[in-house]
Amino acid sequence: DLNFDNIDMQNRMIDAMEYWVKEHDIDGYRADAAHSCPPGFWKKSIDRLKKIKNVLMLAESDVYHPGGSELIELFDMSYNWSGHHELNKIAKKENNLFDLYGNINRNIKDYNSGHILMNFTSNHDENTWAGTVFDRYGDGVKTFAALTYFLPGMPLIYNGQEYGSKTRLEFFEKDSIEKKNKEYFEFYKKLSEIRKENKALHISKEIEFEILDISTKNTTFLKRTFDGDDIYFI
């Protein structure tokens, strides 16, 4: 374990992060298990980095992990773990859309309006340990993927999803991703085009997110609005 009481160690770690921004103009950092480092360290790091460039800081954590809001609000974006687990439960028919509505409302309440949640159906942990999206979502793969574009926040496409990969990639091993399944490439391309072309799907504090119909557990009717632009998810 690192001793974060050692200020010299903290400064050397921040120096290393500054190096890649100054010398290689990288756009930001993903902080793996961000809650394993004290919020004070991240505040110091992010303050110094943003004096160089407005880097994007992504925390692999959420407000329900250690550090809570104090930690997460230091970052521009964090993982929507609670939303992801909700999608998994719905796919397994353990939960329903009422539970998803509850999760959306909790997130709106628990995160400040300027924070970005990263929505996902897969990532390196889930793919390796819990299974591919086809293992977990079955025939609903595309529906749940589209939902990550519609929920408040930013969608994540994990390695291989754009080619419909059914491989559980191993940590620290070389795995090749076959770039053959154009169906999923075109699917994600279309989702991204829809997101780019519709202002209601952009990230903004002024986005209005509305649940229009909660009369059934199995059909959802959602609406996003911004600057006169409306988009619906059914």
Give each language-model segment a name.
Residues D5-E23, D139-A145:
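Short, acidic/polar
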Residues M13, W20, A31, M57, ...:
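Conserved, mostly hydrophobic/aromatic
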Residues Y184-K205:
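Amphipathic alpha-helical
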Residues I211-I234:
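Carbohydrate-binding surface patches
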Residues A145-K166:
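Substrate-binding cleft of secreted/luminal carbohydrate-active enzymes
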Residues I26-D27, I52-V55, G153-M154:
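Loop/turn elements at helix/coil->beta-strand transitions in domains of secreted/extracellular proteins
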Residues D1-Q10, D27-S36, H84-E94, E126-Y137, ...:
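The substrate-binding groove and active-site-proximal loops of carbohydrate-active enzymes
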Residues K22, D32-L117, L147, G164-K190, ...:
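Active-site-proximal helices and loops of the catalytic beta/alpha 8
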